[in-house]
């Protein structure tokens, strides 16, 4: 039996923390589908197509990783892709309560959907897309927090 998992997120932009979790999930599971979410309540810096392309550009070395944009309920996306496991990252205890609520709601909506939590490598535990964008907006160097092509895309988007 092959295990298809979904690692969902906005990825605006994808960071070293995200990439760390994707690489680790790819080592544990047969197929990892990175679900790049369109959420109408969020105002991302990069549009959905840009976020998908950026995620693809930094995961090319992982043959069992697919990048797919989606909107709507995550459980419907999981069903469409025959996935029965969600991978979520927990940076700190403060993430746990919200993630626990989401996991229980997803389980209620799709009982066969399991959620697996991964903690980031210590050097990535404080990185968030929001903080990276804030640093980049103020012309700070984000190269230690995101892959090179993401740093370039941020600079182009913010200052071109």
From Swiss-Prot:
Catalytic reaction equation(s): (R)-4'-phosphopantetheine + ATP + H(+) = 3'-dephospho-CoA + diphosphate
Kindly list the cysteine pairs connected by disulfide bridges.
none
Family as reported in the entry's similarity comment: Belongs to the bacterial CoaD family.
What are this entry's molecular-function GO terms?
ATP binding; pantetheine-phosphate adenylyltransferase activity
The pathway entry for this protein reads as:
Cofactor biosynthesis; coenzyme A biosynthesis; CoA from (R)-pantothenate: step 4/5
In chain numbering, the residues marked as site (Transition state stabilizer) are 18
- What job does the chain carry out? Reversibly transfers an adenylyl group from ATP to 4'-phosphopantetheine, yielding dephospho-CoA (dPCoA) and pyrophosphate.
Q: How does it assemble?
A: Homohexamer.
Q: What is this protein called?
A: Phosphopantetheine adenylyltransferase
Compartments (UniProt record): Cytoplasm
